[in-house]
Curated annotation (Swiss-Prot):
Protein name (Swiss-Prot/TrEMBL): Protein BRASSINAZOLE-RESISTANT 2
Gene Ontology cellular component annotations, sorted alphabetically: cytoplasm; nucleus
Compartments in which it is found: Nucleus; Cytoplasm
Quaternary structure and partners: Interacts with ASK7/BIN2 through its C-terminal domain and with the bHLH transcription factors BIM1, BIM2 and BIM3 through its C- and N-terminal domains. Interacts (via N-terminus) with REF6 and ELF6. Interacts with MYB30. Interacts with IWS1. Interacts with ASHH2/SDG8. Binds to MYB56 when dephosphorylated in the nucleus of quiescent center (QC) cells. Binds to WRKY46, WRKY54 and WRKY70 to cooperatively regulate the expression of target genes.
Residues with Phosphothreonine modification: T175
GO biological process, one term: cellular response to brassinosteroid stimulus
Pfam family, one: BES1_N
Record function comment: Positive regulator of brassinosteroid (BR) signaling. Transcription factor that activates target gene expression by binding specifically to the DNA sequence 5'-CANNTG-3'(E box) through its N-terminal domain. Can bind individually to the promoter as a homodimer or synergistically as a heterodimer with BIM1, BIM2 or BIM3. The C-terminal domain is probably involved in transcriptional activation. Recruits the transcription elongation factor IWS1 to control BR-regulated gene expression. Forms a trimeric complex with IWS1 and ASHH2/SDG8 to regulate BR-regulated gene expression.
Annotated keywords: Brassinosteroid signaling pathway, Cytoplasm, DNA-binding, Nucleus, Phosphoprotein, Transcription, Transcription regulation
Polar residues: compositionally biased ranges: 99-120
Family of the protein in this entry: Belongs to the BZR/LAT61 family.
GO molecular function, one term: DNA binding
InterPro entries, sorted: BES1_N, BZR
Length: 335
């Protein structure tokens, strides 16, 4: 009863599967028939040729497996009843054949070579044998009259004897052995955070090196008393330097620490038009300017460890905070 019930159940399942499966159209069925007829015609011609010209014991109605067995037997292979195929004298172990779809042979890539990269090689990877490279190396050309040399001009003293021997290898890089220090302590792979930190540190270094040049305020005017100095005043056409309030507005901005440590060079001189205001170029003194400088020494005074000279007609230390008045939109100062 159980077997009958199981049979009926399986038949019902098969019928349900056939009912739900899509039925092929008449064109698809015709194509399948034509394809099958062509395959059988080709197989029949193959069998006829093998029977006529080959010493094959093929049955009258045989399939492709029989033909494959006959061909393997002629080529020196052994085909067992279960389909195990191997060369004569190289029968594989039962463990090697179980669970593998491809038959392993001594010439198969599944067998690891003793010279594989997983083993410690006594020969360095860049030292190749003469037969391993498809291109001859100029340092190991045995025959000077070898016509296969790609660069014939390198044979007759083309390479200096002082250079080390050239090693050429076309093989892929091998895995370093376990005894290698790079294998024990591999370099960490770069991450986005490390790359960002490195780029930020490089940008900071570049910005600090750019601060080595002295900076000066562009708004610093050229005082008329600079005519008494060693150079002619530098003028800025875009600015009106007649206003005396720009002199008393604030100190000049200068970072002269780096400039004091080492002398100026042609590459360090900034292109600002007011650079000559602070670092004048040396010029020869004329007798007139020397006399004027001696006259004006009495009106100098110390300001931040430097000599400051007033303009002609200018009063220093006479302007107090009480004399200044803040006007909002009047445009008129307190007289």
């Amino acid at each position: 009863m159980t077997s009958d019930g199981a049979t009926s159940t399986s038949a019902a399942a098969a019928a349900a599967a056939m009912a739900t499966r899509r039925k092929p159209s008449w064109r698809e069925r015709e194509n399948n028939r034509r394809r099958e007829r062509r395959r059988r015609a080709v197989a029949a011609k193959i069998y006829t040729g093998l029977r006529a010209q080959g010493n094959y014991n093929l049955p009258k109605h045989c399939d492709n497996n029989e033909v494959l067995k006959a061909l393997c037997s002629e080529a020196g292979w052994v085909v067992e009843e279960d389909g195990t195929t191997y060369r004569k004298g190289h029968k594989p172990l039962p463990g090697d054949m179980a669970g593998s779809s491809s038959r392993a042979t001594p010439y198969s890539s599944h067998n690891q070579s003793p010279l594989s990269s997983t083993f410690d090689s006594p020969i360095l990877s860049y030292q190749v044998s003469p037969s391993s490279s498809s291109f001859p190396s100029p340092s190991r050309v045995g025959d000077p009259h070898n016509i296969s040399t790609i660069f014939p001009f390198l044979r007759n003293g083309g390479i200096p004897s002082s250079l080390p021997p050239l090693r050429i290898s076309n093989s892929a890089p091998v895995t370093p052995p376990v005894s290698s220090p790079t294998s024990r302590n591999p370099k960490p792979l770069p991450t986005w955070e490390s790359f960002t930190k490195q780029s930020m540190s490089m940008a900071a270094k570049q910005s600090m090196t750019s601060l080595n040049y002295p900076f000066y305020a562009v708004s610093a005017p050229a005082s008329p008393t600079h005519h008494r100095q060693f150079h002619a005043p530098a003028t800025i056409p875009e600015c009106d330097e007649s206003d005396s309030s720009t002199v008393d507005s604030g100190h000049w901005i200068s970072f002269q620490k780096f400039a004091q440590q080492q002398p100026f060079s042609a590459s360090m001189v900034p292109t600002s038009p007011t650079f000559n205001l602070v670092k004048p170029a040396p010029q020869q003194l004329s007798p007139n300017t020397a006399a004027i400088q001696e006259i004006g020494q009495s009106s100098e005074f110390k300001f931040e460890n430097s000599q400051v000279k007033p303009w002609e007609g200018e009063r220093i230390h006479d302007v107090a905070m009480e004399d200044l008045e803040l006007t909002l939109g009047n445009g008129k100062a307190h007289s």
